[in-house]
Every structure is written in C-alpha cells, then in structure tokens.
C-alpha cells in the first residue's frame, strides 16, 4: 500500500484513461517557454476528486489537483495564474437555484428564484467570468478545467439533463472568443453536452 510501484500503477491508469477528443492545428502538446504566462481557469482545476461517495469513494493519502500538477510540471520559470471562472453555490443556495432547469417549475417559482437568491449569485457569476476572461487575455496559454463534480457525479439520483452546471458553457464560450487556442479539459464520469465543441481546437476528457 502506497508503495512506489502502486503510485506508478495508478498514475499509468489515470494517464491511459484520458481521451484526446480533439486537437486541431496541433495545439497540444503545449509549449510553455520560460517566462510565459499560463492561465488555468475552472473550479475543477483546484478541486479534490478522489473522495467520491458510496462505492466510488477512495481513501487517498493525497491528491495532486490539475492546478498543482501544472505548477509542478512547469516549475518556477513559468507564471501560472488561476481563476475559478464560475461560482459554485453552497448547499443552501444550490437547493434554491436549479442549474439544470427542471421543467416542473412554475413561472412564479422561476421569477421568485431569479429575484431572491438568483440575483446575487448571478452578479457573482458575472464577476467571476469577467475575471477569468481578463486573465485569459493577458496570458500566453489558457487551460480550462471543468466538467462535473460530486454534486452531479453521484450515485442515487438522476441528472435532469446533460448540461454542464454552474454556467460553464458561458465561461467556455467567452474564453474561446477571447483566446481561440484555449485548451478545454473535462472531468466527468458521465456524458455532458458540449455546444462549444466546434469552436474549441483542443478537448481532453478525463474521468
């Protein structure tokens, strides 16, 4: 347990499970020269994924997030900056706001939602989006790391649809408009819609 051999094995499994869905114009592999600025955007870049629930739970001694891995790989000669790009509400906010637009809501429910808890959260989302776009525009390389998290990639419930939560599609669209070579990395254990796929030059899928 936790031997060098085991660590190499799980690293190999993780690498082999990744799928390069798209790589136009040979955007990948990235060439981060000394002194360049790299923007890592998306909450999943800094999130811990191993502590799942139920049969998916792993008692990991440690986990290297994508953001940590990028910083470790590039070393001190490259400036790596991070922005979440979107806001993940706490459990109370999430219970009041339906990110996946369930059709059972009435017009009255929707109006109440948007004027009470939705307004403040939407302002935070727009601020996070603006921060991410500004960071992307000032960087040489842009990497978006998004997808699902344990609020949606769980056992015991069905997703209403296959849309990305937390307004991620809007964030990705804005990043691709600002920096067409933005690399999109998805972390998910189930399919998701990717309406921006035609615009993206590089898409990497990870489980």
Where are these predicted regions, by residue range?
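C-terminal non-catalytic regions of proteins with extracellular/luminal or membrane-system context
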Residues: 2-4, 8-207
